[in-house]
Amino acid sequence: MPENLAKAIANPLFPALDSLLRAGRHVSSDDLDNHAFLSDFEPDLALFYQRYHTELVRAPEGFFYLRPRSTSLINRSVLSELDMLVGKVLCFLYLSPERLAHEGIFTNQELYDELLTLVEEKKLMKLVTNRASGSDLDREKLFEKVRTSLRRLRRLGMVITIGDTGKFRITEAVFRFGADVRLGGDVREAQLRLIRDGEAVVHTPEPSQQSLLENPTAEYDEEQTEWEDEA
C-alpha cells in the first residue's frame, strides 16, 4: 500500500468520512476538517476508491463526492421526483441575490413559497395526490413532503440546518442539480428553465438500497431517479 494512502486510512477522520461518502454525502468547504483531509489526500483516495469501481470527484465548485460506475461495488442512490425538484430550486436560490442579502440563510417557508412560484401547482399536487388540484389538507401534505426532501438533501450535504429554527444554509453542493447550466450565459435563467422544463433521461431500475448518488444531469420518472454520469 502506498505510504500516503496508508496515512490517509490511518487518519482518525477516515472511518466516519468514508461511511458518509459511501452513503452519498457531499463534502463542501463548510465541513472544514473533512474537506481539508480530502484535499490533502485526494490523489491517494482516488486510487483507493477506484478499487471499488467508484470515482472520487472534486467538482468545479470545490466539493467532493463519490460517483459509482456501472460496475461499482458500492450501491447507487435514488431520489424522488420531488427531491430532485427541491434540489433544483435550492440551486436557483443559491444563485439568487437574496442569498447574499440573507447571508445565505433561508427558511423552510421561503423554500416552499419559491417552489410554488417556480412550479405549476398542478404539477406539485400530482406528486402528492396524483391529481392536478388539491385541498388545503393536500397543500399541508405537500409542505411536509418538501420538508422531508429537505431533510434528505441535508443528509447528502446540500444544506446545513441552523438549530431548530426552521432555517438552513445552502452549500455549493447544490450545483449537483445545476451541472448542465454552468456553460456561460445567464445561469440563473438557465436554472429556471431547468426547473420548469426539465432535461431528461428516465431510469426504471430500482437499486436495493440507498447509498451513493450519481449525477443529476437527468430528469426523473414519477417514482425514482438514478443520478447519471456528468457530461
UniProtKB/Swiss-Prot annotation:
InterPro entries: MukE_C (IPR042037), MukE_N (IPR042038), Scp_MukE (IPR007385). Pfam families: MukE (PF04288). It is found in: Cytoplasm, Nucleoid. This is Chromosome partition protein MukE. Keywords: Cell cycle, Cell division, Chromosome partition, Cytoplasm, DNA condensation. One of its GO terms (cellular component) is cytoplasm. Involved in chromosome condensation, segregation and cell cycle progression. May participate in facilitating chromosome segregation by condensation DNA from both sides of a centrally located replisome during cell division. Probably acts via its interaction with MukB and MukF. The lineage of its organism: Bacteria, Pseudomonadati, Pseudomonadota, Gammaproteobacteria, Vibrionales. Residues 204-231 are annotated as: Disordered. One of its GO terms (biological process) is DNA replication. HAMAP family: MukE. Residues 219-231 have a biased composition (Acidic residues). Interacts, and probably forms a ternary complex, with MukF and MukB. The complex formation is stimulated by calcium or magnesium. The gene is mukE. Gene3D superfamilies: 1.10.10.2250, MukE-like family, C-terminal domain. Belongs to the MukE family.
